[in-house]
């Protein structure tokens, strides 16, 4: 009986702890840039890798550069482990796509799943483009507005960012018209008020951008929303397929253990019930015998 109780306790412990690996040796950490992923030339940026898993070490790796992997001892603060990588004096050589990994001391060669990629871009290298709004920077809620980024420089790609947003939109430059190269970013409906800037870049150096355009404030009158269209991010209605895959996989793994726990609990209760019935059996027989004896005595008195 004690072995069964111990087994039930162990299964319940794992279910409560949720100790199921998501992917890799440990689940992926998060990678952030402070103050942001767009860094002016010669300025400093801090890349922070953090996780609620207590990693002792973090590794920072830039894609395509094997000799630029940095290792840092993690700090444990308020239930979070983190490591800060400072990139001083930003140059073209340091721009690119970064990922970070976590590891623990007793398994230093087993890394966690990689963090989501983070693009670090150097800005301020080329002539700034111009940013304008059509029909104008002030529109009614529900109306369409188009932001046009243009320059006489032959940029291959234009990037539009909104102040306070982590991601940006990008479009290839259209054919040269009136000695300018232009990309038009439609915002439809016009519920995306905020301050916008645009940048230009060349095809062979996607992480090296121009200077920022002058800021453009788009004002939306009426009922406005701060939603920002992102073709790369799914809406909350459709959900993230990757996240759903993790949830489904975790549920499939937990289901057999849940069934096992139910089976053990049912068997334990059945054994307990059977033991209780066996204990009550002799007492019941003695009661019946006493009743039979009393009934026989009563019959003898009556015949007498």
Curated annotation (Swiss-Prot):
Major localisation: membrane
SUPFAM superfamilies the UniProt entry points to: Immunoglobulin
Pfam families, alphabetized: ig
Keywords, alphabetical: Cell membrane, Disulfide bond, Glycoprotein, Immunoglobulin domain, Membrane, Receptor, Repeat, Signal, Transmembrane, Transmembrane helix
Cytoplasmic membrane side: 265-304
InterPro entries: Ig-like_dom_sf, Ig-like_fold, Ig-like_Receptors_ImmuneReg, Ig_sub, Immunoglobulin_dom
One example of a Gene Ontology biological process annotation: immune response-regulating signaling pathway
Protein name as annotated: Killer cell immunoglobulin-like receptor 2DS5
Organism name: Homo sapiens
Top-level taxonomy: Eukaryota, Metazoa, Chordata, Craniata, Vertebrata
Gene that this polypeptide is encoded by: KIR2DS5
